[in-house]
A protein has these predicted regions:
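Sec-dependent signal peptide recognition
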Residues: 3-15
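N-terminal signal peptide c-region/cleavage motif recognized by signal peptidases
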Residues: 18-20
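Flexible, polar/low-complexity N-terminal or interdomain linker segments that lie immediately upstream
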Residues: 22-117
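Hydrophobic residues at beta-strand termini and immediately following loops
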Residues: 125
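Short, charged, surface-exposed secondary-structure boundary motifs
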Residues: 132-142
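Catalytic cysteine-centered active loop of the rhodanese-like fold, especially the PTP/DSP P-loop
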Residues: 140-165
Length: 165
């Protein structure tokens, strides 16, 4: 009876140790495992894939593609435009989820890319609608600036002082 009990105890402890090893998870940051945002009316959990053996989707794995269009881009896209990293983006998504109406997160990928995935909690405004050099209609661009961003046109210039972040 003692051996049976001891073997059972060892088995249970090994299960608990294994469960504990998996429970630690693959966090986003040391103090951030995940966040929940609302996307198109549904709650979405943002977290890293918990499988440490996971590989990048082959559709995103190419490292050598013709430039243009697949050119390396600067981290600072234009003067006055703030560049942020993934953790800062998650902070903005959390603020938006908590009701901060000054935050607007835009996924600027084109529709064919958005079909493959998007930023949960964002709205899609393709970069082609935001860039005059890509053929964006100036009137549609002005409408986006005013209605989506909250910018104010003043004597031919745009005032972003009260625009969404």
């Amino acid at each position: 009876m003692g051996d049976f009990f001891m073997n059972g105890l060892i088995f249970i402890l090994s299960l608990l140790w294994t469960a504990g090893a998996f429970a630690s998870g693959v966090n986003i940051a040391p103090d951030l495992a995940s966040i929940v945002v609302t996307h198109q009316g549904a709650k979405v959990l943002i977290e890293r894939n918990q499988n440490p053996e996971n590989l990048v989707n082959p559709a995103y794995a190419k490292t050598s593609r013709e430039c243009p269009p697949f050119c390396i881009q600067p981290i600072k896209i234009a003067p006055g435009v703030e560049s942020i990293g993934e953790l800062e983006l998650l902070d903005y998504l959390k603020a938006k989820e908590q009701g901060d109406s000054s935050v607007l997160v835009i996924d600027s990928r084109t529709p064919n890319w958005v079909e493959r995935g998007t930023i949960p909690g964002s709205i899609n405004i393709p970069w082609t609608k935001l860039s005059p050099s890509a053929g964006a209609d100036p009137f549609e661009l002005a409408e986006i600036f005013a209605q989506r961003f909250g910018a104010i046109e003043q004597e031919g210039f745009w005032n972003y002082a009260e625009a969404k972040t």
